[in-house]
Amino acid sequence: MAKTQIKVFGFDHKVVDEAAKKLVSLAVATKNKFVGPIPMPTKREEVTILRSVHVNKKSREQFESRTHQRLVVLENPSSELLDKLKRLELPAGVGLKFKEK
């Protein structure tokens, strides 16, 4: 029994949810079994930099980026569905990772 895990990720959670819904609707339209979208833990990356170059060590600025993720698992996906998924139009700022199991 082949399973394909599709990880949807991006910086804006609303856009990531929208992309995950597109994947699910495509799976429903092609009558494939699926699980998800499952919310995965948000990755938070924080960077601290000095405001000035050589002086004022106490004056710093912090930036963070959050990467939101959703997981959709397809059970026995058809080749037609996989082709459609690879050509799917997604909003800007959303990425997909495919993993076969």
Swiss-Prot record:
UniProt GO cellular component terms: ribonucleoprotein complex; ribosome
Keyword field contains Ribonucleoprotein: yes
InterPro entries, alphabetized: Ribosomal_uS10, Ribosomal_uS10_dom, Ribosomal_uS10_dom_sf
GO biological process, any: translation
Keywords (A to Z) from UniProt: Ribonucleoprotein, Ribosomal protein
SUPFAM superfamilies (UniProt xref): Ribosomal protein S10 (SSF54999)
Pfam families listed in its UniProt record: Ribosomal_S10 (PF00338)
SMART domains: Ribosomal_S10
Organism domain of life: Bacteria
GO molecular function: structural constituent of ribosome; tRNA binding
Family: Belongs to the universal ribosomal protein uS10 family.
Role this protein plays: Involved in the binding of tRNA to the ribosomes.
Classification via HAMAP family: Ribosomal_uS10
Subunit structure: Part of the 30S ribosomal subunit.
UniProt protein name: Small ribosomal subunit protein uS10
